[in-house]
Amino acid sequence: MKSPFWSWNGRIAELKETAKATGVDLEAEIRLLEERLARLRKETYENLTPWQRVQLARAPGRPTTLDVLEKAFQDFIELHGDRAFADDPAIVGGLAYLEGEKVVVVGHQKGRDTKENLQRNFGMPHPEGYRKAMRLMDLADRFGYPFLTFVDTPGAYPGVSAEERGQAWVIAQSIQRMSRLRVPAVTVILGEGGSGGALAIAVANRVLILENAWYSVISPESCAAILWRDAKEAPKAAEALKLTAKDLLQLKVVDAIVPEPEGGAHKDPDRAIRNIKEALLKALEELKGLSPEALYEDRYRRFRSLGAFAEP
């Protein structure tokens, strides 16, 4: 997403260079421009369109699951493989500590560059990825550890190989398995939350979403291609899908919005990760003390209430 502020930044930099070269005091003019730029940035980022937020959710440099695990957790030990076919690098998971508490973590993992994106299939899991996630769900249940997931995927991989290995069936199994957890479950949507590929690891007691992330049954481009026969209508589709954090909170699809640094999480990943950690700890505190049966019932009620409405 191209910054609309480059001309302002350029003008401020030019004035600073002029002041340095000539010795003329331009401090007042520079301060005035910086104040105007700050107001403009605030107004712009508070009023982004849904399509602009989708673009921010896809921005290179946003925190990935492994970034969060490295900076917000301690002693992460990654576990590999589904014990049936292969290890899927599009989903990572394992054991870790969060402020001294043992947890099990699972998340989609995109690459940080083209080479890694190809290796991780752009964060689009195969069936073995979801089987690995279910293996970790069983581990969390067996030892009574909270189960934390991080969502960032355009969707489950739709290729022939994945379909041959039962992609739809495995996603359904993962949804069912997570819904039956007897431990606290919290999901954070980091960037993209595309369709069943996201929902498969998002059936949690608390679902949190970053300010510029999106979560929907379909991507705007695919929706536009179906409804308007033209993927270029994606901005219109993004508006209609109600996929932004603000819309999702209003619809009670998510429980809380995690604030991002101005300009998006990719502008200051460390600060974004600190915000994620704080939100996770708060969500876990809310669930602390609930019995396994109460956690199950809480999750059941949460998802059964989605889409409920009253006749006028």
Curated annotation (Swiss-Prot):
Similarity remark: Belongs to the AccA family.
GO CC annotation terms, alphabetical: acetyl-CoA carboxylase complex
One of the Pfam families matching this protein, by short name: ACCA
Cleaved signal peptide residues: none
E.C. number(s) listed in UniProt: 2.1.3.15
Official protein name in the record: Acetyl-coenzyme A carboxylase carboxyl transferase subunit alpha
Example GO BP: malonyl-CoA biosynthetic process
Gene Ontology MF, one: carboxyl- or carbamoyltransferase activity
Assembly with partners or alone: Acetyl-CoA carboxylase is a heterohexamer composed of biotin carboxyl carrier protein (AccB), biotin carboxylase (AccC) and two subunits each of ACCase subunit alpha (AccA) and ACCase subunit beta (AccD).
Alphabetized HAMAP family for the sequence: AcetylCoA_CT_alpha
Root EC class: transferase
Keywords: ATP-binding, Cytoplasm, Fatty acid biosynthesis, Fatty acid metabolism, Lipid biosynthesis, Lipid metabolism, Nucleotide-binding, Transferase
Pathways per UniProt: Lipid metabolism; malonyl-CoA biosynthesis; malonyl-CoA from acetyl-CoA: step 1/1
Domain CoA carboxyltransferase C-terminal: 32-286
Catalytic activity: N(6)-carboxybiotinyl-L-lysyl-[protein] + acetyl-CoA = N(6)-biotinyl-L-lysyl-[protein] + malonyl-CoA
Subcellular location: Cytoplasm
Function according to Swiss-Prot or TrEMBL: Component of the acetyl coenzyme A carboxylase (ACC) complex. First, biotin carboxylase catalyzes the carboxylation of biotin on its carrier protein (BCCP) and then the CO(2) group is transferred by the carboxyltransferase to acetyl-CoA to form malonyl-CoA.
Biological source species: Thermus thermophilus (strain ATCC BAA-163 / DSM 7039 / HB27)
